[in-house]
Amino acid sequence: MEADASVDMFSKVLEHQLLQTTKLVEEHLDSEIQKLDQMDEDELERLKEKRLQALRKAQQQKQEWLSKGHGEYREIPSERDFFQEVKESENVVCHFYRDSTFRCKILDRHLAILSKKHLETKFLKLNVEKAPFLCERLHIKVIPTLALLKDGKTQDYVVGFTDLGNTDDFTTETLEWRLGSSDILNYSGNLMEPPFQNQKKFGTNFTKLEKKTIRGKKYDSDSDDD
């Protein structure tokens, strides 16, 4: 009986909250409609023109990004190409990979998805064997590593899968949240609420730039099978 009463009470509380939310949405819509009704023709025309300008600007920005190679996950052939790619785009994610490292292939799949969703960010990959100078300069020692660059400068790193839950089964949303935490893409969710089911399991300690040290030219693998 007590359990049934608790469920009934919870249902009533939930119903009340839904009604309150619906009421607030309706009030907001009514307010917006009232504002439109009170506008004269000139004001409506200015509002229409303002929105058209915003749409044109957004379309121009999209075309500019696409012309610079955004919207797809691309491999660059050498470290020389890296500098030009980074120079022309505000936000860049570069995956430093190695063919023999299994976890790099896992990242490839998620990055390909995000590249199409986030046109504001350029997504690249570079084989570490073809970029020894760059890897030393950026302190790339663990494979895979994502270098996150803003305005041509390295802002953060995602080293291995530590920040992604130390599991091969992390979701694309988890990687998206991690990149959003570094302001390298436009994240629409709440950064204070990571898409983890178990926060204690996954943790929240990110790999910071200042912790990187050069220990030689051998690359460590984050994959168990490598």
Curated annotation (Swiss-Prot):
UniProt xrefs under CDD domains: Phd_like_TxnDC9
Predominant cellular place of this UniProt entry's protein: cytoplasm
What keywords were assigned to this record? Cytoplasm, Cytoskeleton, Nucleus, Phosphoprotein
- Give the InterPro entries listed for this entry: Thioredoxin-like_sf, Thioredoxin_domain
Residues in Thioredoxin domain copies = 74-180
PANTHER family reported in the protein's UniProt record: THIOREDOXIN DOMAIN-CONTAINING PROTEIN 9 (PTHR21148)
The record's function comment reads: Significantly diminishes the chaperonin TCP1 complex ATPase activity, thus negatively impacts protein folding, including that of actin or tubulin.
What's the protein here called? Thioredoxin domain-containing protein 9
What organism is the protein native to? Homo sapiens (Human)
